[in-house]
Amino acid sequence: MLFLGFSSGLPLLLIFATLSLWLREAGVDRAEVTYFSWAALAYSFKFVWAPLIDKLPVPLLASRLGQRRGWLLLAQVAVVGAIVLMAQSDPGTAAGLQWMVVAAVMLGFSSATQDIVIDAYRIEAVEKELQAMMASTYVAGYRLGMLMAGAVALYLAAGFGTTKEVYVYEAWKWTYF
């Protein structure tokens, strides 16, 4: 459960905190940064598609892995794909900024979906007596993921050569990889 918590905490700060700094260093206009608020909507409205995830099986995966694990695998592949797309998108260019918006929205949606599945899986995986331990282990992993996406990511970006004064796309690219 620690690793599932980590995989939930990591995307949150990659979208909201670390990305804002990256965009500012790339010289993205504040008006254009507002497009990235679409990524946050997925977290706010995940209750809308949560019942679908409970009811609909993922073709091919559900029969092999089960309902929850099938959705979890699909969501995690989408999270990784979105992070890779973000790493490949230079927001310092117009086309790169558009792809960055797409990747951030994709990351928000897939991460919110992953949160839905992990919460359901955590509740169903163990007996009631172990729920508190599972929840605390999940939260510890979540916090570690947030730490990695926040402070560690900024440390890496600086280590790869980007600063407030000098924008280095390659530094951010390797940080997100």
Q: What function would you assign to each model-found segment?
A:
Residues 106-141:
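Cytoplasmic helix-loop-helix junction between adjacent transmembrane helices
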Residues 58-59, 70-94:
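C-terminal ends and interior cores of transmembrane alpha-helices
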Residues 1-43:
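Helix-loop boundary and gating motifs at the non-cytosolic
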Residues 23, 27-28, 57, 117, ...:
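Short helix-loop-helix connector
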Residues 54-61, 87-91, 148-170:
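Transmembrane alpha-helix termini and helix-breaking/packing motifs in multi-pass membrane transporters
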Residues 42-49, 132-158:
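Glycine-rich segments within core transmembrane alpha-helices of 12-TM secondary carriers
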Residues 32-59, 79-80:
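Central cavity-lining transmembrane alpha-helices of secondary-active solute carriers
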